[in-house]
Structure formats: structure tokens, C-alpha cells
Amino acid sequence: MLENIRDAVRKFLTGSTPYEKAVDEFIKELQKSLISSDVNVKLVFSLTAKIKERLNKEKPPSVLERKEWFISIVYDELSKLFGGDKEPNVNPTKLPFIIMLVGVQGSGKTTTAGKLAYFYKRRGYKVGLVAADVYRPAAYDQLLQLGNQIGVPVYGEPNNQNAIEIAKKGVDTFVKNKMDIIIVDTAGRHGYGEETKLLEEMKEIYEALKPDDVILVIDASIGQKAYDLASRFHQASPIGSIIITKMDGTAKGGGALSAVAATGATIKFIGTGEKIDELEIFNAKRYVSRILGMGDIESILEKVKGLEEYEKIQKKMEDVMEGKGKLTLRDVYAQIMALRKMGPLSKVLQHIPGLGVMLPTPSEDQLKLGEEKIRRWLAALNSMTYKELENPSIIDKSRMRRIAEGSGLEVEDVRELLEWYNNMNKLLKMVKRRRGSIDKLFGGKIG
């Protein structure tokens, strides 16, 4: 899936096919790639319908080309498909912190227990592993081998068939030894299709241990079948989260991820390889960036981020116009940094008042002048203290000299910035509550 979609993005952005035709071709390739990755057909067509709806309803911001804007919509909607902005919390909320792993046979649960232990050990926690999978003869030996490999102690009783008893003893032992995180590897004797028995066993061990987190381990190769298992687990264990393993070895990883995300369950980690350190905190946006080709879309995402930051500053200016608060030099700094992310000066300088480049098509000399002015202003702002940025009225002549010396500028440069800032605040008060004033002030909306 990754290669096909990545190639489609590159072809779309660099090809000479007319825009409308290129969009249709891209959407067809996206549908084909997602379905071949075992993403549910209904989810796929719902996704592409949303993309088309946004194309018809929304207008591209001026800082993005039409093709860039389209890819930013694809990025946004794909991110939602795989879980959106939901950020998993991987930090323990208390110590000791008990994690219980559950999963069917073959899901990679025991290997994941070792990876998880290594993940937390690298973060400075004292970790203990409990081998409570009594149904698979090799489970204890495997966990012991992993523990020795990463220097983490393992508690197990190879001759005891009582999983609950082993789990309780193991947890008690590690609590006495002042371990920070205790990971319990429970039985995985049931195959897919026997989820009811798996969840019943999970509840029994849960009642005995009262763990702080229950994690269901799912093999990515089951694709969209993950929906039923994840859904039932999510309903049975409100504190639970999910790890999807073997993402590197199957074409169905996208299907498993989208299926789990559709249940509302939290995907905490994904396994990206066989090595002990190949466990990655799951982030939907980062995953989608990888699908689309980070190198191809990085500049687009940077522009979108700049636009979002700019809109926050614009909202602050509207508040100032309404008499709520005052614009600070910190806001000015944030505004300039946001505009710099949005692309060439020929597109964005006209949106900053007072730079002398307010013409629709600034000349090359005007652009150079504006660019130099921005460079000087940023240097001055970077030389100011927190108090000066928040309250510019305290900047007297001696402070101006210090700022100028610290930034390699003349005092006149600092004075010019402060005069512009004061004029800006006066102008904002003058146009208070007047509809469209912010657009006049900025020479036209960016979005």
C-alpha cells in the first residue's frame, strides 16, 4: 500500500495531467490501494466521498497551489481514518504501574512484552516481566530469553499451571522489589473466532490483579477482522488500549489500523519489525505522512501549519479590535514565523502591514527590502527578554542599545520595529468592531 500511494502522490504533484483528471485518477488509485490493504470497502468509499465533498465546498488558501491543497485534504482525511488527533498516553500515571497483556495465539504477545519492557527500561524505569502464559510450553523460555537479552528480570513458575496464581505472585514479588513497571504476559491459548473465551479469561485475571492498563495485542495480518475483536475488547475493558504487531510483514496493516480506529479504541503502539527496539508509539498523522511520502508532502504540511498558526494570531488581533487585550511583540514574532512557513515572500509579504510591499505583485527590489526587514526584526525580537516581548513599553533607550548590540543591529532598527508595533496597536483600536477591517489591515485574507 505504502509504495503505491506514495508513487501516486509524487505523480500527482509533478505530473502534467489536467487538475480535474489528475484528481480523479489519484482518488481511484487511493481506493484501489486501501482496499488491497484490506481496509473496509465502506470506510474507503466514505473517505473518498469526504475528500470530494471538501473539494466542492472549500476554497484553497492562497498560500497553497490547488494540487498542494488537494493533498493536504487527503492527508487530513486519511489521518482521521487511522485515528485522527488521538494521542496515546504511554507514561505511567502512578508507580508501580501494572500492565496486563492479552491476545490470541500467534499475535506476537510475548515478543511484544519484551519490546514493551525494553521501551520503558530505555526511559529510565525499573521493569519486571511476569510469565503467566501457562498454555504455551515455550512462552516462559521465550520471555526469559528476552528478559536476559535486555537485562530485565522475569518471574515465572514453569511447573505451575495456575495463571492467576503466577500473575499475583509475580506482581507481589516485583512490588516488594520496588519495580516501577510490571508487565504481565497472560495466556493466549484461543485463536481468532474464540474471542468470547479470551475476554472471559481476561476478566478473571483482571479481577485478581486489578492492573492499571490492559493491552490487547493484535496481529496486523488479520486486517479488517480486527474490528470485531477490538470492538468487543474496547467494550469489555474501558481502560484498555491496543498494540498492533507485525506491521512490517503484511499488506493488511492499513486494514487492521483503520478497523481498530473505527471502534474508538486507542492504538498505543505498533510493532514495526522483529528487533527488540522496533516498537513505535502510534501517531496517525505520522503514519499517514509515511504513507504519502514525507519528502513529497513535508513542504505542504509546513505551509498548512503556518496557516493554522497565522489564523490564531489573526484571531488575537480580532480580540484586540474588540477591546480584549493587547497585541504583544511575542504575537508579532509568532505571526512572522507563521508567515515564513507559508512559502515564498512574493505570496506572503503583502499580508504584513508596514513593510512597504503592499502591492499585489511586489518588485524584486521590494521583496529584497521586505526580506531584509523581516530578518532584522527577527534578530531584534530574538534578543529581547520575556518581559520585553510581553510588555514592550518597558523598552527604553538603554534596553534598545542592549537589544541592538545583541542582535548585531543599529538602534534605529530596533526603534523602527517598536514604532511599527505601536502604530499597529493604534490602528487595531481605530478599526475596532468594523467588519472586514482585519482584511484591510493585512492586505487581504490568506485563507
UniProtKB/Swiss-Prot annotation:
**SUPFAM superfamilies, sorted:** Domain of the SRP/SRP receptor G-proteins, P-loop containing nucleoside triphosphate hydrolases, Signal peptide-binding domain
**Reactions accelerated catalytically:** GTP + H2O = GDP + phosphate + H(+)
What compartments host this protein?
Cytoplasm
Domain of life according to the entry: Archaea
Q: What is the lineage of its organism?
A: Archaea, Thermoproteota, Thermoprotei, Sulfolobales, Sulfolobaceae
Known EC number(s)? 3.6.5.4
Where on this chain does GTP bind? 103-110, 185-189, 245-248
- One Pfam family of this chain: SRP54
Protein name per the record: Signal recognition particle 54 kDa protein
Against InterPro entries, the record matches this protein to: AAA+_ATPase, P-loop_NTPase, Signal_recog_part_SRP54_M_sf, Signal_recog_particl_SRP54_hlx, Signal_recog_particle_SRP54_M, SRP/SRP_N, SRP54, SRP54_GTPase_dom
Top EC group: hydrolase
Q: Does the keyword Phosphoprotein apply?
A: no
Organism, by scientific name, is: Saccharolobus islandicus (strain Y.G.57.14 / Yellowstone #1) (Sulfolobus islandicus)
Main location (coarse class): cytoplasm
Q: Which GO terms describe its cellular component?
A: signal recognition particle
